[in-house]
Structure formats: C-alpha cells, structure tokens
Curated annotation (Swiss-Prot):
Family assignment from sequence similarity: Belongs to the V-ATPase E subunit family.
An annotated Gene Ontology molecular function: proton-transporting ATP synthase activity, rotational mechanism
Domain of life per record: Bacteria
InterPro entries, per database record: ATPase_E_C, ATPase_V1_Esu
Pfam family, one: vATP-synt_E
Gene3D superfamilies for this protein: ATP synthase, E subunit, C-terminal (3.30.2320.30), F1F0 ATP synthase subunit B, membrane domain (1.20.5.620)
The keyword Ribosomal protein is annotated on this UniProt entry: no
Protein name as catalogued: V-type ATP synthase subunit E
Native source species: Thermus thermophilus (strain ATCC BAA-163 / DSM 7039 / HB27)
Amino acid sequence: MSKLEAILSQEVEAEIQALLQEAEAKAEAVKREAEEKAKALLQARERALEAQYRAALRRAESAGELLVATARTQARGEVLEEVRRRVREALEALPKKPEWPEVVRKLALEALEALPGAKALVANPEDLPHLEALAKERGVELKAEPALRLGVRAVGAEGKTQVENSLLARLDRAWDALSSKVAQALWG
C-alpha cells in the first residue's frame, strides 16, 4: 500500500499546488479590485471631506479584507473538496491497476482478522477471482454483491455480524484528519 500511497500523494500534491495557485490568484484579484475602488474613492474626494473619506476608506478596507478572507476561506474549501474528489477518482481507478488484486486481498485479510469465525466473504463480482485462493485457504464462502465497490465484507455465522472494509469507507472515516493535514501542508 505504501507505493499506492506514494502515487496518490504525488498526484494529489500536484493537483493541490495547481488549485492553490489558482485560488491565490483569485484572492489577489479580489483584493486588487477592493484596493482600486478605495483608491478611486480617495481621488474623488475633496480636501474638505478628508475626514469623511478616511472613515469611508477604513470601512472599505475592512470590507475588502473581509471579502478577501471570505474568498480565501471559500477557495480553501473548494480546494479541499477538489482534493477529495480527485482522491476518490484515484481510488475508483485502482481496480484497473495491476496492484489491485493484492490490495483487495489485503482488504479481505483485514476484514477476516476483524471478524474471527467469519463464514463468508462478500465482494464485487469482478473481485471474486482475486479472492478465491484466500477464501479456500480460510474456509469461507465467496459471495458476489455488485453494489460493493473497492472493498469486501466479512460475514459471520447467520449473517448477523458483518465487517466491511472498503477504501471509500476508509476515506470517509479518515477525511477530517486527512483534510486537516492537507490544509496544514498547503496553508500552514
């Protein structure tokens, strides 16, 4: 999995950098626009209105800073959502990669270890050939479930106990921590 993580990390980092540059450019444009408006207002005022102008300028600068801060926050949220979308795309492309059989086998092993005495292993029909040897070795039945993607489910006796181990579920569970690390890496 470390090779996969490295590949994903490189792809995600490149996308993050591109998105960050785009977000920063947008924020700078908004900031420049706010500064230009404030400067135009300054030039339009007469000396007699200098005190009023300064108050208006302070309000405009505060509004501009708030607008920039809001735009940055929104851009950061968009960057993180784009990162998540691209990670999901990368995960969904894994079944087409040569390392997928080993990945799905490891997911199955983890699920079986988490549920001692499992009687069945459920997976997407396309993944069943990759799991036949493991199922035979562990003495569990293989079952197909087309809706189960990028993972497996170990099922206990009578089907009452189940342990699902899928990459998308792992991403969902870990997203808060991962997004915090991505944000820290990007924005400090």
